[in-house]
């Protein structure tokens, strides 16, 4: 697991070294340094390079490793806009073709907005390397040579942008680069312009598949090959990912030939930033079968593992089981390095990027103290990712020529190749797919090709016009399995991934998110029942073994226990403001020792509605909506009086506290209190609120009142007025431990990370099912203090997204699908038998 470490503000040397120490204490061995929105140092300037020295030096001192990132934000290739702004010949440009009144055609070209580079121009890429890679190599030479620096990450270098043509929208537009027409003539013996005009007149010809094939070859040689050669020469890995990996049409337009391009990296990468884990029909976001398999083919081609960027787009309150599931999806496709989004120095990057919030990082209470749980799981997943699939693997040809033609020609009224549908059907039914290029040889037993109309051909048998269901039936007929998973009625199980490896082991991953499944593992005819938790993984060694714990002899609920409920932090309540910058809070009874927490982070910015930062004076492409703001310090009033915030903030979360100030504690009377933003932008940033109230209070139906200090029962935090609480809540009580041979404690906490202590002993942490703990035998029959600590994400403190109006669209759902957080159920599982209780993965 590799934290994606976003550098914001102006970190001091002490802060840098403390950050590295905090990463290592979680058992994490490396991190990636990422220059992100909110960085207040000159990118690639002296202070930035000195900061990188501090990171590398501290990593070396601790025996850790560092990954570099080759850009400010993304896409890669510009050195924060310097490359294209130095030379218009290096700027992204497109041809545009128009029809004249007489029916002839007119060609023109136009440049993209400033800052967008043409990655198909070798000289532009060479300049990018000179400004970025060479500067790092000179400044960080020691850490290149002693292998502290492992590699450099390149991010979406083929990213598209809108190009505005002065004459209006052309009939067709496409990327222009030097030498294109000569390359086309050499490949076809024809003229590019003649073939484009023929296509415009007749809609006939292969001009677009040829053009995008050539563009892919140029992209590979100009960009990936130059970067790879530089990395090879300096003894580090080239990794990263392309744009539009999930869509064959978008990938063709942006990358030309994604199979060819990704094979240019020494550690091929992918991203899965939507965090999809649900294979049921209609689920959104949908699992990216094409992305995974494009990455897998490149991993197999290179033979040294792969890398995935994960989780970036949230939702922020995804439970750890979801993050684990996506990590294992990567492992099932040969990916063994997991970039975990997002660890930040502070959250000021949200000023520009406030359309999404990642579910990992120390801003989340569960992650801050227990990221090691996910890091430990990453090591297990990586070990399994490096295994070799032994059976039920089929080849599928990537339909690049068809995708390229349709990407440019349009797909209205046409059903194109359904690569996604075939991969999904085969993978969810216990087969493994290996993508191969259109003309590549393979020794796999079945080879499928995608046809128009969403049909398929199989090359070994000569069968054509197959549906995805036909292809599945053919695989089942031709490819027997030594290991498979069945439903209890004996039919093959679906909506899961299954792999069997050459060492005789097998792995099963549940892609049904809410249902534990009672299944049967069949190995060489021997059947073994097992329980597969929702979103869970089950690992089978080469030797068959019982996979279920014995059924408890009795179950005793702790529902009648009276608990003390303590909180690790104050409760907080966002003040929601309307369009006029006014808001209210209603208090039912006086509150003691509360504080107002005021935003102190004001930054100038200009950003498109999709989240792309642009220069404050940059003119956007036609059709881009731009949000512009010039920084104005915040000031607030409460009930007509100015709010004074003399203290540094200690009431929120790490990464948020540095961006806020707080008042001294005060008493808040009962009644309605009115708040106003008298200076500063409107409160339209969901993830960076303007004003909070913090203290020991509860909230019921939007009304605040003192929190009860009495005993509580089991229940969600919202039942106690703590729906917005962000931190760790601990239920504690003296309990009688059952006097049985073996006892296990089972909890339901809404899937949140949970720690249990009994009689002062730490029994450990659980972050996914089963939420069960073995009770020490010497405590049987005794009374002891039971402490159950449940940790939230950061999401609760943002409040209800329906309560405000936000100026940027959310890239993903704001909130995850899991239920309420709390201590929802607790049971003793008593087992009198001598057989040991076995852990279910």
Give the residues covered by each predicted segment.
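Membrane-proximal, cysteine-centered motifs at transmembrane boundaries in secretory-pathway
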Residues: 748-756, 763-776, 795-797
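Short acidic/polar inter-strand loop motif in beta-rich domains
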Residues: 680-687, 790-799
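Glycine-centered tight-turn motifs at strand-turn-strand junctions
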Residues: 669-671, 769, 775-782
């Amino acid at each position: 697991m590799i934290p994606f470490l976003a550098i914001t503000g102006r970190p001091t040397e002490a802060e840098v070294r403390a950050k590295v120490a905090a990463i290592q204490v979680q058992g994490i061995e490396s991190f990636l340094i990422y220059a992100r929105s909110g960085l207040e140092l000159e990118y690639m300037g002296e202070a930035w390079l000195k900061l990188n020295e501090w990171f590398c030096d501290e990593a070396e001192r601790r025996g850790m490793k560092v990954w570099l990132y080759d850009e400010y934000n993304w896409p890669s290739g510009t050195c924060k806009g310097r490359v294209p702004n130095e030379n218009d010949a290096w700027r992204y440009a497109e041809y545009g073709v128009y029809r004249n009144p007489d029916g002839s055609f007119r060609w023109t070209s136009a440049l993209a907005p400033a800052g967008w580079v043409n990655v198909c121009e070798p000289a532009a890429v060479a300049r990018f390397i000179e400004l970025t890679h060479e500067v790092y190599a000179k400044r960080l030479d020691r850490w290149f040579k002693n292998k502290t620096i492992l590699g450099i990450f390149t991010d979406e270098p083929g990213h598209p942008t809108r190009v505005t043509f002065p004459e209006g929208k052309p009939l067709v537009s496409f990327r222009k680069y030097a030498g294109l027409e000569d390359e086309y003539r050499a490949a076809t013996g024809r003229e590019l312009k003649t073939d484009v005009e023929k296509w415009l007149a007749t809609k006939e010809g292969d001009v677009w598949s040829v053009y995008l094939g050539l563009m892919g070859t140029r992209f590979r040689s100009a960009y990936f090959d130059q970067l790879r050669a530089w990395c090879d020469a300096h003894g580090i890995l080239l990794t990263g990912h392309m744009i539009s990996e999930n869509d064959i049409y978008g990938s063709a337009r942006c990358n030309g030939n994604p199979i060819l391009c990704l094979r240019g990296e020494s550690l091929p990468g992918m991203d899965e930033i939507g965090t999809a884990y649900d294979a049921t029909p209609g689920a959104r976001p949908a699992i990216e079968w094409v992305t995974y398999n494009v990455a897998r083919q490149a991993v197999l081609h290179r033979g040294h593992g792969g890398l995935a960027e994960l989780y970036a787009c949230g939702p922020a309150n995804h439970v750890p089981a979801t993050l684990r599931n996506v990590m294992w999806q990567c492992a099932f496709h040969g990916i063994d390095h997991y970039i975990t989004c997002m660890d930040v120095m502070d959250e000021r990057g949200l000023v520009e990027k406030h359309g999404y919030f990642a579910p990992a990082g120390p801003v989340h209470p569960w992650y801050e103290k227990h990221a090691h749980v996910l890091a430990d799981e990453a090591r297990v997943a990586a070990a399994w990712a490096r295994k070799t699939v032994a059976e039920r693997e089929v080849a599928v040809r990537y339909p690049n020529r068809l995708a390229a033609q349709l990407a440019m020609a349009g797909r209205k009224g046409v059903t194109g190749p359904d690569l996604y549908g075939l991969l999904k059907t085969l993978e969810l039914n216990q087969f493994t797919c290996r993508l191969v290029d259109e003309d590549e040889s393979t020794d796999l037993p079945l080879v499928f090709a995608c046809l128009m109309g969403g049909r398929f051909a199989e090359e070994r048998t000569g069968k054509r016009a197959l549906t995805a269901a036909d292809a599945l039936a053919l695989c089942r007929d031709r490819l027997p399995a030594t290991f498979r998973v069945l439903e209890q009625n004996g039919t093959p199980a679906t909506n899961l991934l299954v792999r069997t490896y050459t060492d005789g082991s097998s792995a099963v991953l549940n892609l049904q998110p809410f249902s534990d499944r009672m299944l049967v593992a069949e190995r060489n005819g021997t059947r073994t029942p097992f329980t597969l938790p929702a979103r869970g993984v089950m690992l089978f060694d080469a030797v068959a073994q019982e996979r279920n714990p014995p059924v408890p002899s009795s179950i005793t609920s702790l529902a009648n226990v009276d608990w003390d409920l303590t909180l690790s932090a104050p409760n907080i309540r966002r003040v929601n403001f309307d369009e006029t910058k006014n808001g209210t809070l209603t208090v039912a009874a006086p509150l003691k020792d509360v504080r107002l927490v005021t935003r102190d982070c004001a930054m100038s910015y200009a950003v498109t509605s999709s989240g792309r930062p642009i220069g404050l004076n940059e003119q956007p492409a036609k059709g881009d909506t731009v949000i512009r703001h010039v920084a104005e310090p915040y000031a607030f009033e409460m009930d007509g009086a100015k709010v004074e915030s003399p203290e540094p903030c200690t009431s929120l979360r790490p990464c948020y506290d540095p961006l806020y100030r707080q008042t001294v504690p005060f008493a808040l009377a009962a009644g309605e209190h009115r708040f106003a933003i008298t200076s500063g932008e409107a409160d339209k940033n969901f993830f960076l609120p303007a004003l909070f109230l913090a203290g020991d209070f509860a909230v019921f139906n939007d009304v605040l009142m003192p929190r009860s200090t009495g005993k509580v029962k089991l229940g969600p935090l919202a039942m106690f007025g703590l729906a917005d609480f962000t931190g760790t809540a601990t239920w504690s009580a003296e309990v009688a431990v059952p006097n049985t041979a073996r006892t296990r404690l089972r909890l339901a906490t809404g899937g949140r990370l949970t720690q249990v202590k009994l009689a002062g002993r730490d029994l450990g942490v659980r972050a996914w099912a089963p939420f069960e703990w073995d009770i020490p035998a010497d405590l049987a029959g005794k009374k002891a203090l039971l402490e159950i600590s449940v940790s939230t994400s950061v999401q609760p403190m943002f409040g209800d997204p329906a309560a405000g109006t936000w100026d940027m669209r959310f890239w993903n759902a704001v909130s995850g699908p899991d239920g309420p957080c709390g201590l929802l159920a607790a049971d003793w599982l008593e087992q009198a038998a001598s057989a040991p209780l076995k852990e279910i993965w």
